[in-house]
Amino acid sequence: MIGRIIRLYRKRKGYSINQLAVESGVSKSYLSKIERGVHTNPSVQFLKKVSATLEVELTELFDAETMMYEKISGGEEEWRVHLVQAVQAGMEKEELFTFTNRLKKEQPETASYRNRKLTESNIEEWKALMAEAREIGLSVHEVKSFLKTKGR
C-alpha cells in the first residue's frame, strides 16, 4: 500500500523513479521495488528521505485516507477518497456515474464536486479522479458508508 502512495505522490510531482531516487538519495532499484509492492516494509530513514523530497508529511505515506483528507482542502477530499475506493474495488465508471446521479437526486448536497453538480459536462474531471483511484486501494463499503453519513 505505501508503495502505491509513494508512486501517486511521485507522479503528481512529475518525477520519474530515477529523479526521485537521485533527489532523495535512495536506490532506484529499491524505490522501484517499494512502489511495485515487492518490498512492503521500507525503513523509516528511507521514508523520511522520500517524503522530504516529495514535500509531504511522513504520516501521509502510511495511510491513503489521511493523505487524501489532509492534502485536499474543502469538501471535495471526501469525494475524491471514495471515488478512488469505488474504482479500485472494481466499480465501473458508468456504474459510478449512475450511482452518483441517483444520489444527486436523493441528496443534492452529496453529489457536488468542487461546488458543482455532477453532470455530463464535468464527467471528465470525475474520470481523472477515477484514474487516480487505480493508484490507491480503497473499498466500496467505505464509499457507501461515507455517502450514508453525508446524506444524514
Swiss-Prot record:
It comes from the Bacteria. It holds the Pfam family HTH_3. One of its GO terms (biological process) is regulation of DNA-templated transcription. Residues 6-61 form the HTH cro/C1-type domain. InterPro entries: Bact_TransReg_Diox (IPR050807), Cro/C1-type_HTH (IPR001387), Lambda_DNA-bd_dom_sf (IPR010982), SinR/SinI_dimer_dom (IPR010981), SinR/SinI_dimer_dom_sf (IPR036281). Keywords: DNA-binding, Transcription, Transcription regulation. GO terms for molecular function: DNA binding; DNA-binding transcription factor activity; protein dimerization activity. Residues 113-151 form the Sin domain. Residues 17-36 bind DNA. Coiled coil: none annotated. Represses sigma(D)-dependent flagellar genes and activate the eps and yqxM operons. Repressor activity is regulated by SlrA. Controls the initiation of biofilm formation. Component of the SlrR/SlrA complex. PANTHER family: HTH-TYPE TRANSCRIPTIONAL REGULATOR, METHYLPHOSPHONATE SYNTHASE. This is HTH-type transcriptional regulator SlrR. It comes from Bacillus subtilis (strain 168).
